[in-house]
């Protein structure tokens, strides 16, 4: 089967191939190309055909270095079958030649290929897959692997992702596969009247206050507001800004309704048996807790705007067959209301309804200790897996 030379593609041609490819990712999408263009990079879409059908493609961006030289980058690597060595070799040679003709000095790729499967504690899964051969093949094509780096690095793409597979599972199956603590927290958030709303870029200042608070509390770096505004500008409707708010009036009504039910139940079991005495004690303790929550409402009113208290938020990106939880946080004083659980369960359901195959939060470090610290709801799921991706940089020099 004959392979073509490297072809320049239109944005439309590239998107038709990329959006349905197994290695599709928001970072190798046309929306990513638009974002690079906003930042002043040159943007190209190139590919190779086999017998008239597109077989490989990539987003290729470049920026000027010193003199006339340019740095080239293929975000999340090439979209092709990495097991097809002939195609991989042709793509590598074609892209290298393309860059060389345009004064390329360096070419970097960070393939969106799972290297090895790990469990939720960051340990290698026995009998799990390992794609070392792809690393070897890329090296044979002239790339130099920079190693499986560890730690948090804002300059490079994440290497660890916790992935929830949504295929062949309905909502009830997904929910029941959560651990007991997660199911309890989701139900508790619903009882706490946590409501989820999708907002536009006008709400980014509110989101930034949340994410900056969370970053300071948890000790991680974050992007500035300009970064997220550029996301909205480039990705449009693919970006979902979700805000988790408490409906204060609904919460207060729910507490008073539960209080009345407990009081009625208590009055109906007045008696002297040991069993009833224990039940009465439990009800009185629950009534005390409800009264404390009602007093807490007065404090919550200090944070309310138009009857709602903003507690948390997150930014998600939908592209291809996956939804990525890019960034999010919760005000520390509201953690016990579990807004993050409500938000992530809401978006898992949204991804399922949209027919996506997976949902994943980005985990930007390879430290097992750090993994345990930063993983959120989806990382607690027994049905999720942690993958180390082959995104440690591969460099080609010319």
Give the positions of each predicted feature.
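A conserved beta-strand-loop-helix scaffold within acyl/acetyltransferase catalytic domains
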Residues: 4-68, 114-116, 121, 131, ...
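Acyl-donor binding region in acyl/amide transferases
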Residues: 68-154, 311-313, 317-387
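Secondary-structure boundary/capping signal
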Residues: 103-106, 170, 239, 355, ...
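A structural signal for short, well-ordered beta-strand segments and their strand-loop junctions
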Residues: 105-110, 195-199, 243, 358-362, ...
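Glycosyltransferase-associated regions of secretory-pathway enzymes
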Residues: 267, 271-273, 283, 383-389, ...
